[in-house]
Amino acid sequence: MKRVVLLLAYQGTAYAGWQRQPNDLSIQEVIESALARVLGKPIVVSSSGRTDSGVHAYGQVAHFSQPDHPLFSQPQSIKKMLNAILPKDIVIRDVVLSDVNFHARFSAIAKEYRYSLTRSPKPLPWQRYFAYYPRHSIKIDLMQKGAKYLLGTHDFASFANHGRDYTSTERTLFKLDIIDNEEIVTIICKGNGFLYKMVRNIVGSLLDISKEKYPPEYIQEILAQKSRRKGPPAAPSHALSLHHVCYPKPYNWFCTPECDINSLKEEK
């Protein structure tokens, strides 16, 4: 039995998210259909996480397990064959083989999401699919002050939408950076895991601070309430991307130096 691991990127605009849906097209459905054509049998794929409708990915990781197949000794052939039949908005970046102890979701030690804001009411044509225009001045200094209250380990129940069951709503944010590139502002959010719509709700709270709906320190009160009822509105999905998933050795095929667990602890 082999476990095949995929590194993939996709533009989520045309899809109802990662997970299969009864009446809508999903990334998972397209990937599984392509694999069935390549391997000649039904395939079920598990991902590192279920991105929502409209959300993109640069570094999504997924895996599937099947009895030996001649192609399993040629992972780059699998990559080439999949990319030949997948639509242009889904790309397999790499394929590797693993032992069956690896799991795309449960082996992950951290994820990094990126959210893009634009200062332009009429962004460049391709930016409208990947960046959100908030219709007010983006005040980086205020957003950075609010972001510092979210770093570290907290109960993020106020930032989680209903719809998922969790044994705990406690998560750790290692990084919450706001990078100003003039026209585009990028919010980089890295943590050991994320609740349903947590990143979009964090961005929503920072945007409320930016338009001075409340002061940066109010983030502490939102956290303390531990209730979504008083939480911030979610930012739109189309500007969010799953950028990277970190795994420990020996499963760090796609990792950067920042994925080392010791460096993650230092950032915390």
Curated annotation (Swiss-Prot):
It is an enzyme of class 5 (isomerase). This is tRNA pseudouridine synthase A. Homodimer. It comes from Chlamydia felis (strain Fe/C-56) (Chlamydophila felis). The active site is at 52 (nucleophile). It catalyses: uridine(38/39/40) in tRNA = pseudouridine(38/39/40) in tRNA. It comes from the Bacteria. Substrate binds at residue 113. Formation of pseudouridine at positions 38, 39 and 40 in the anticodon stem and loop of transfer RNAs. One of its GO terms (biological process) is tRNA pseudouridine synthesis. Disulfide bonds: none annotated. Keywords: Isomerase, tRNA processing. GO terms for molecular function: RNA binding; tRNA pseudouridine(38-40) synthase activity. It holds the Pfam family PseudoU_synth_1. The keyword Kinase does not apply. Its EC number is 5.4.99.12. Belongs to the tRNA pseudouridine synthase TruA family.
